Amino acid sequence: MSFVVIIPARYASTRLPGKPLVDINGKPMIVHVLERARESGAERIIVATDHDDVARAVEAAGGEVCMTRADHQSGTERLAEVVEKCAFSDDTVIVNVQGDEPMIPATIIRQVADNLAQRQVGMATLAVPIHNAEEAFNPNAVKVVLDAEGYALYFSRATIPWDRDRFAEGLETVGDNFLRHLGIYGYRAGFIRRYVNWQASPLEHIEMLEQLRVLWYGEKIHVAVAQEVPGTGVDTPEDLERVRAEMR
């Protein structure tokens, strides 16, 4: 099954300026992400960036670059520009791999592409089980609840589902059915074209989660449990030091 990986790599970052180019053990972070994507067996890998320095680093590593506008409000909007510039057919399977995930396992890149290809749905993603209450109550850990067929009912920074009896006892662990969403998505190109023509939804603005736009407009998102748990992503200088140590 063929699929394309697009890696959005925005240069500007409030907490970590020039994030795609930060050095991790002798290589820019974006090159580590590119290498993980290559291991997935993708037919084509494109780094979508708004900065010449990022483009040069990717091209020096033998990667393909698509220059995009700097004013996109989300990674999906950046993907949409690439979809149009590359004239992908509507049924092309595209996996969005975040440019700040240098430890993402290649197996889950392939997994999300396979899951999408096996279903008549526009979008697929992954999640991992939550086992401790600290993560369940952390607003930076996005939670997702599913229906019986594995489709998302809702994504939230809040603690969902609310385990009334267990939480009343102040337990440190959580029961079953708690899932943390992973920021990796598979789409068909035609779905991306439709998505960017929808107005942002009120829930999306409240939670600051762009995937809620999909549910708002009545579309489905399939969610599978990831075959591997990805390593730390890089959002802050502290994350960067942790990743450097783990990848040493």
Curated annotation (Swiss-Prot):
InterPro entries this protein is in? Cytidylyl_trans, KdsB, Nucleotide-diphossugar_trans
Pathway named in the protein's UniProt entry: Nucleotide-sugar biosynthesis; CMP-3-deoxy-D-manno-octulosonate biosynthesis; CMP-3-deoxy-D-manno-octulosonate from 3-deoxy-D-manno-octulosonate and CTP: step 1/1; Bacterial outer membrane biogenesis; lipopolysaccharide biosynthesis
> Pfam families, per this entry?
CTP_transf_3 (PF02348)
- UniProt KW keywords: Cytoplasm, Lipopolysaccharide biosynthesis, Nucleotidyltransferase, Transferase
A single MF term (Gene Ontology):
3-deoxy-manno-octulosonate cytidylyltransferase activity
Which GO terms of the cellular component aspect does the record hold? cytosol
What EC number(s) has UniProt assigned to this enzyme? 2.7.7.38
Q: What is this protein called?
A: 3-deoxy-manno-octulosonate cytidylyltransferase
Which species is listed as the source? Shigella flexneri
